[in-house]
């Protein structure tokens, strides 16, 4: 913020004409005698912490006014003091807050924002009558006083013991996934080793799933047909999961106007990692989650207690986060991503806690379905935890009984976010680092900020809202799946995706030309049964065809020669049951193969293979 403070005999103004960002006001003219006139330009940096810049500006104005023994203050917006202006919405709020704070001890006149104004001023002309000041968002000692402190515990749900984490506890931990998550939370750095790229980065390129798009911004991907199929199947999976549990799908914009106070305040809580830009005189942002559109939609709804809990779901395609370039890592951390996002409106905390528990189990189910085990951490403010210990311990006990695992508990001394409780579930990658995926959060702020109300008789109640991503971003889910596939190789298992997610579930390879007609019949039977099957008709050796099927992670490789045609039994290599150098082969009829694959994919979403059936016709994308 830039300010120009003038000790004035008087300041007089008249608002002449509106601009596009003019505030609504009845104060179109005014005059104040014997005053301190404060010309103010709100800058972009002020948006990172509006409360701090208001506090610091008020302190500076009070100090100057007291030195000059002045009791009258004019707050005058003056954009010409800076070439790096903040958004109009931020400026209006900051100026209004400054006026409000000063009004406790001074007579204050504030000129309207966003109007062309004429003004007359008489400067007293003494050595302290003209002062310029740059106001920053520095909080000085206040930050230290208000710092929220965390304590971490290991919770054994069966015994319901809480053990505070220390070096001895860390040294004794046997659950490697939970230990990796705990070290990440405690910011314990491992000894530096030459690791290179995570395995999933190699896989996404080698398997023609996706790749960096060099002509876009860093952290944006192009998706090839196989990758698009996987992403669509994952999206279908989450859609079915939430709709079965009462979620109502919606779609909202990806771009929002920061002049809306609620939008800006919610965006500011996320910090600087946003795509923001100015277009047509408006300060705009690209969403980093579906909160904005869903909250604006809920604000316009006429909600009654009987409607609750009310769940709105959106597959946020895309969401954007301006991560630092040096932090961008494959599908784990990127700038444009697909986020399944459900928000649940709850009447009160009791209903919110019931929904939280339901959504915890829903999130854990996704790990079961993907075969990617999670480590989990609960996070609660001290007050919330003290009030709801019995509920938490019952939930932790059920988790231990179902999964046989301990969990981490973080207790925060106060609230530093919009939530009072949350749970995060993480896959651990091949480098021993967590990939946080599903999350559930109890939000106690946003309903009031966005004006969301429930009509309960004559009362209007601000509800509690749960944020839930049942899987985390689709890209991170795939990241976890691929990292888990690599970890399988360390246990002498071939890397693979779950059958329902594998682009090519079955490949039929004829030994010779005379076997092609029968092989095509088999392929067509598989495809007509909803199985993604292709046919390797390339002019290559049998050995290379089988190796290619392995490279493509085909779940079932069917070889057809004389004996298969004569017996009607197919020789099938089953990838999931094989070892790295010891393929597991079975003799199955076409019907038995169809039944085997169908049993593995029962209840899972299905889509056809988006590639030509014949391998010779499938293009190479990279």
Swiss-Prot record:
Pfam families cross-referenced by the UniProt entry: HGTP_anticodon, tRNA-synt_2b, tRNA-Thr_ED
Gene3D superfamilies attached to this UniProt entry: Anticodon-binding domain, Bira Bifunctional Protein, Domain 2, D-tyrosyl-tRNA(Tyr) deacylase
Protein task: Catalyzes the attachment of threonine to tRNA(Thr) in a two-step reaction: L-threonine is first activated by ATP to form Thr-AMP and then transferred to the acceptor end of tRNA(Thr). Also edits incorrectly charged L-seryl-tRNA(Thr).
Editing domain, as annotated region: 1-136
Chief place of localization: cytoplasm
Gene: thrS
Domain notes: The N-terminal domain is an archaea-specific tRNA-editing domain that hydrolyzes incorrectly charged L-seryl-tRNA(Thr). Catalysis of tRNA editing is performed by the charged tRNA itself.
Protein name: Threonine--tRNA ligase
Catalytic activity from the UniProt record: tRNA(Thr) + L-threonine + ATP = L-threonyl-tRNA(Thr) + AMP + diphosphate + H(+)
Annotated binding of Zn(2+), by residue: 291, 343, 467
Family (UniProt): Belongs to the class-II aminoacyl-tRNA synthetase family.
